Amino acid sequence: MNLLIKGGRVVDPSQNIDDTMDLLVEDGRIKEIGKGLKAPAGAEIIDAAGLLVTPGLIDMHVHLRDPGLEYKEDIVTGTRAAAAGGFTSVACMPNTKPVNDNKAITSYIVNKAAKEALVNVFPVGSITQGSKGESLAEMGELKESGCVAVSDDGRPVVNGELMRRALEYAKGMGIMVISHSEELALVGEGVMNEGFTATELGLKGIPWAAEDVAVARDVYLAEFTDSPLHIAHISTSGSVRIIRNAKARGVKVTCETAPHYFSLTDDAVRGYNTNAKMNPPLREAADVAAIKAGLADGTIDAIATDHAPHHLDEKDLEFNLALNGIVGLETSLPLSLQLVEEGVVDLKVLLEKMTCNPAKILGIDRGTLKVGAAADITVIDPDREWLVAAEKLASKSKNSPFIGRKMKGAAVYTVVGGKVVYKID
C-alpha cells in the first residue's frame, strides 16, 4: 500500500527535523520526505494540516499478559490499545505464565504477534530462570529467539552477585539488562508511598529509600562491570540524583519514568482508590518536580507506560489486597504532551524520549522517519480534547486512575509498516 501524508508538522528528533512537510510511503517504507510531494496513482492520502507527524511512538515497558494471563490482556487487545495510544512498537515484559525465560515462550510471542498484533511486539526475556532470582536464564537463547532485552520486571534481582554476572553476560551478548530496582526488605508490607498521606489513611508505607538503595546498588554494579544498564520506572528524587551523578561519571546507565510519576502524587490514593496503586508507588510533589527536572535535563532517557492490566476482581478489593498496576497505553500521549504545555520540555525532546531513545536503548531499527526506514508513523492532534471513559478503552482491563479525566492531545492515525492500523473516530 502506498500512502501520502500531506502538510503536517513533521517532527523527527532522529534527523533534527521540525517543519511543515509531506511524507511518502511505498511498500511499507519511507520513500520520500519533503515539500510538495505528489501522490502515486492509487495512494491513500492523509491530510495532516494542523497535525503533528512523528516517528511511530515506542513503549519499551508493557505487560501484554500473554501467555497465561489472557483474562487481563492479550496480544490482540494490548496492541489494539497501543495503536489507539499512537504506539507502533511495544516491548513486552516477561512476567507471563509461564515466565518468558526460554526459546519456546519467546517464539510463541513472536509468532502470535506476527499473526495477530496491530503493532510491532518486541519480547523482553527474564534475567533469571522463572524470574526467581536463583540462576540466570539462557540469555543467548533468548536473544537468538527474538528478545531485545532481559528483565525480571515485577521483582528485583536480590542477589548482588547474580546481578553482577547478569550484567557481564548481557554485555558480552549485546543485550540490555532492564532493572526493576527495589529493596524488598525496605518495602515490607507497604502498599503506598511512606509519608503524610499514608499515615492519614492508616496504610503501611513504602519509603523512598526502597527504590534509591536498589538503584544505587545497580548503578555501582554497572560501573564496576562497565556494562550497559537500563533502570525501569524511576519515581523518586533520589533515583534522579543517583542516575544524574552516575551519567556524569560516565556510567553506561539509562532510565525511564512513567507518565503517572510526573502527573500524579500520592494524594491520588485518597478515597482508597486502588487504581492509584502501583509499584513503585505514587510519590510526593517534590518527587514529581524532580522527575520533571530529570526529563528536562536529559537524566531520564525515556517515557514508558508500565502498562499493567488487571481484571476488575483484582482491583475491586480493599486497598491492601488489590494488585499493583495501571493501564497506560491510551493515556500516555496526552499526559506526556502536558510536559510541553507546561514548558518542562520542548516537543522535540519529548519525542526523543518516546521514539529514538527507546529504540536506541533496545537496539531496534525503529523511531525514525529516515528514507528507507520502516514506515511506522504517528499522526497527532495536540489540541484534541477527550474524556477518559472506561467503556471506550481498547484495553481488556480498565484499571486507570485517569478515568473521568479530561485529556488534551490524541493520536488520530497510527501507521505500522505503511498500513493504517488505527484511525480515530
Curated annotation (Swiss-Prot):
<dbReference type="GO" id="GO:0008270">
    <property type="term" value="F:zinc ion binding"/>
</dbReference>
<dbReference type="InterPro" id="IPR006680">
    <property type="entry name" value="Amidohydro-rel"/>
</dbReference>
<feature type="binding site">
    <location>
        <position position="153"/>
    </location>
    <ligand>
        <name>Zn(2+) 1</name>
    </ligand>
</feature>
<feature type="active site">
    <location>
        <position position="306"/>
    </location>
</feature>
<dbReference type="GO" id="GO:0044205">
    <property type="term" value="P:'de novo' UMP biosynthetic process"/>
</dbReference>
<feature type="binding site">
    <location>
        <position position="153"/>
    </location>
    <ligand>
        <name>Zn(2+) 2</name>
    </ligand>
</feature>
<dbReference type="InterPro" id="IPR004722">
    <property type="entry name" value="DHOase"/>
</dbReference>
<dbReference type="GO" id="GO:0005737">
    <property type="term" value="C:cytoplasm"/>
</dbReference>
<keyword id="KW-0862">Zinc</keyword>
<feature type="binding site">
    <location>
        <position position="95"/>
    </location>
    <ligand>
        <name>substrate</name>
    </ligand>
</feature>
<dbReference type="InterPro" id="IPR011059">
    <property type="entry name" value="Metal-dep_hydrolase_composite"/>
</dbReference>
<keyword id="KW-0479">Metal-binding</keyword>
<dbReference type="Pfam" id="PF01979">
    <property type="entry name" value="Amidohydro_1"/>
</dbReference>
<keyword id="KW-0665">Pyrimidine biosynthesis</keyword>
<comment type="function">
    <text>Catalyzes the reversible cyclization of carbamoyl aspartate to dihydroorotate.</text>
</comment>
<feature type="binding site">
    <location>
        <position position="306"/>
    </location>
    <ligand>
        <name>Zn(2+) 1</name>
    </ligand>
</feature>
<keyword id="KW-0378">Hydrolase</keyword>
<protein>
    <recommendedName>
        <fullName>Dihydroorotase</fullName>
        <ecNumber>3.5.2.3</ecNumber>
    </recommendedName>
</protein>
<dbReference type="GO" id="GO:0004038">
    <property type="term" value="F:allantoinase activity"/>
</dbReference>
<comment type="pathway">
    <text>Pyrimidine metabolism; UMP biosynthesis via de novo pathway; (S)-dihydroorotate from bicarbonate: step 3/3.</text>
</comment>
<feature type="binding site">
    <location>
        <position position="61"/>
    </location>
    <ligand>
        <name>Zn(2+) 1</name>
    </ligand>
</feature>
<dbReference type="InterPro" id="IPR002195">
    <property type="entry name" value="Dihydroorotase_CS"/>
</dbReference>
<comment type="similarity">
    <text>Belongs to the metallo-dependent hydrolases superfamily. DHOase family. Class I DHOase subfamily.</text>
</comment>
<feature type="binding site">
    <location>
        <position position="180"/>
    </location>
    <ligand>
        <name>Zn(2+) 2</name>
    </ligand>
</feature>
<feature type="binding site">
    <location>
        <begin position="63"/>
        <end position="65"/>
    </location>
    <ligand>
        <name>substrate</name>
    </ligand>
</feature>
<feature type="binding site">
    <location>
        <position position="233"/>
    </location>
    <ligand>
        <name>Zn(2+) 2</name>
    </ligand>
</feature>
<dbReference type="InterPro" id="IPR050138">
    <property type="entry name" value="DHOase/Allantoinase_Hydrolase"/>
</dbReference>
<feature type="binding site">
    <location>
        <position position="279"/>
    </location>
    <ligand>
        <name>substrate</name>
    </ligand>
</feature>
<dbReference type="GO" id="GO:0004151">
    <property type="term" value="F:dihydroorotase activity"/>
</dbReference>
<feature type="binding site">
    <location>
        <position position="63"/>
    </location>
    <ligand>
        <name>Zn(2+) 1</name>
    </ligand>
</feature>
<dbReference type="GO" id="GO:0006145">
    <property type="term" value="P:purine nucleobase catabolic process"/>
</dbReference>
<dbReference type="InterPro" id="IPR032466">
    <property type="entry name" value="Metal_Hydrolase"/>
</dbReference>
<feature type="binding site">
    <location>
        <position position="310"/>
    </location>
    <ligand>
        <name>substrate</name>
    </ligand>
</feature>
